[in-house]
Every structure is written in C-alpha cells, then in structure tokens.
Amino acid sequence: MLKSLTRAKFEQLIPTIATGAQYAHYWGKWQNVINRLLVSVVAVVVVLILRLILGESAEALILLLAIITGFYWLWCPIYQASMRNAKARRLQYSGFWRSRIEDVYLTEELIGEEETVNQRGELVIVENRERRINLVLGDETGFYVTIQAPLQRIHKGIKRGQTAELLLLSNRQDLSTVDKVTDAYIPRLNLWIGSYPWLQRDVFLEVSRQLGGSRRSPDNYRYDDRALRRRKYKR
C-alpha cells in the first residue's frame, strides 16, 4: 500500500531539529567524542589568542566565540543531524509505503581504514569492516528497494514475508520516481531498521495506526491507484 502524505505531516515525520535517536546516531563512539573534544580545545585556544590580539574591544565577540567553540563537542551532533534532515526536507513529496520483505541477506562493508606499524616496523593499512543486514522490500507492482543496517542480535527475527513500513520521498507528485527512502518499521517485531533514524517515530506509528496498522501480509491489502503505477528508485 502506498498513501501520499501532506506536506505538514511529512515535516512532522522528518523534523527540522534532530531527534534523540538522530543525536545518538551522530554522537558516535568514544573515538568520535574525543575527536570533537580535541577540536573544541584547539578552537578555544585560537579564540584566546584572538582575545590577546584584539584586546577588550572585542570582549563580547570573544565570549560568544568561546562558548560556541567550547561546546562544539556537544552541539556538533545536533548540527550534523539537522543538516541531514534539511537535505531530505528539500524533497517536495512523500508517501507512506507498506511493503513486504522479499529477501534478507548479510554483507561485509568497509567502514574505514587505519594506518599502523607492524612488528617489523612496516606501515600497514588495516581495514575496518562491519557486518550488515540487507532487506529487499517490494510490492505487487514490482517496485523494490534495499535498506541496510549494522547487524545486531535483535535482527534474528526478521524473515521473508513480514511487513515493513517506511516513507518514500520524491520531487514528483505521483511518486513515480523515488529519490530517497527512510528507515523501516517492522510491526510484527516492533523493530526499526535502517542506516539512519530519519523518522519521528511516535508520529510515524500514529500514521501507521490511522492507515490500518499492520500485522497482516501486504498481499491482503487493497492498493490505491498510485501503488499500481510503476515506480523507479534513484540509486
């Protein structure tokens, strides 16, 4: 089932300011926190040097810069998530898509590289890889997308045939071309899955309930006219 949403509802689902889940996503691991702290320390030192150069004439500006740079490590995740949200909100149209899990498979993805020195003093590059779960979601029109997330224990209950609900985003009113998809909700498992928590989840669950909830197979749903049109996903 594909149901178009109003612009107002779309803006509730992907808010301007980062949600708690989005903040946690960009907070990252302890290495990320340390990196941001180092940036804050260096920036504060630069501000103090500017104070010595400019003197008391720029006291108010220096104080403002010191506060901003000193708390960079804290507000940076909010900024990053909000900018990512803003990019998605530039897309004009959205639709609630109730799909079916057509396939589930695992992959290993390269997420970074580190340079280190081995016991012989040689410089070597160590690849950091992460196991990820991939879900192929589709409907009766033949349209499908693949969403991916880091593999976790809670994913072991995911199976083919289960319902998955998410948003399709597009610049075309008929959603015939899909520019972006959000993270997905699997009602049977009460589980969210995706590489980034795009959605305001309480609002999305309310939309899902208004559209009939979901514990049945999508094969039993009555599809609207838009769902019967062929759609194309921009990769």
Q: What spans do the regions from the language model cover?
A:
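N-terminal membrane-targeting/pre-transmembrane regions
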Residues: 1-46
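A composition-biased, non-transmembrane "mature-region" signal
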Residues: 2-21, 92-114
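Transmembrane alpha-helices and immediately adjacent membrane-cytoplasm interface residues
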Residues: 58-89
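Intrinsically disordered, low-complexity, charge-dense segments enriched in Lys/Arg
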Residues: 63-65, 140-142, 147, 159-162
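Acidic, Ser/Thr-rich low-complexity segments on the non-lumenal side of membrane proteins
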Residues: 95-140, 145-146
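Short nucleic-acid-contacting surface segments enriched for D/E, G, S/T with interspersed K/R
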Residues: 150-167
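OB-fold/S1-family single-stranded nucleic acid-binding modules
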Residues: 169-218, 224-231
